[in-house]
């Protein structure tokens, strides 16, 4: 049997960021971008991506620390070695995420969806989503000639977000 090692994720998906090293024994701070922060540890293996370089890592141990986590990487027990990963992106292969039910979606799936208001006016294309304390925000690249800035639309289901059509890749919003 041949052992094949994947050195780069298939369908890369950003799920977190590496912070600075912690202590002298090779621990490092981790910032999770997952909806439930602790679920970042359900999606393995991780790949660190920094300065166009991929590094597949294995987690030896992790702990909750303040509002984030600290991680000990297998085979690294030196602060100077682990510090090379500071500010790296934490990437997984998209296929490691759980399968979704019909009409469910992950945030990254709706990037590039077209956005229309309920009057069928085309507003633009989704370029990002951000989490805020009160509600998530849909960032739309504005296609209206009047304003050139991005449109920020609160992601409030049924009130503002009327429909997310995953088959036709568009979002219908209550927005002027």
UniProtKB/Swiss-Prot annotation:
Keywords: Chaperone, Cytoplasm, Ribosome biogenesis, rRNA processing. It comes from the Bacteria. Residues 102-175 form the PRC barrel domain. Coiled coil: none annotated. GO terms for molecular function: ribosome binding. An accessory protein needed during the final step in the assembly of 30S ribosomal subunit, possibly for assembly of the head region. Essential for efficient processing of 16S rRNA. May be needed both before and after RbfA during the maturation of 16S rRNA. It has affinity for free ribosomal 30S subunits but not for 70S ribosomes. Binds ribosomal protein uS19. This is Ribosome maturation factor RimM. It comes from Buchnera aphidicola subsp. Acyrthosiphon pisum (strain APS). The lineage of its organism: Bacteria, Pseudomonadati, Pseudomonadota, Gammaproteobacteria, Enterobacterales.
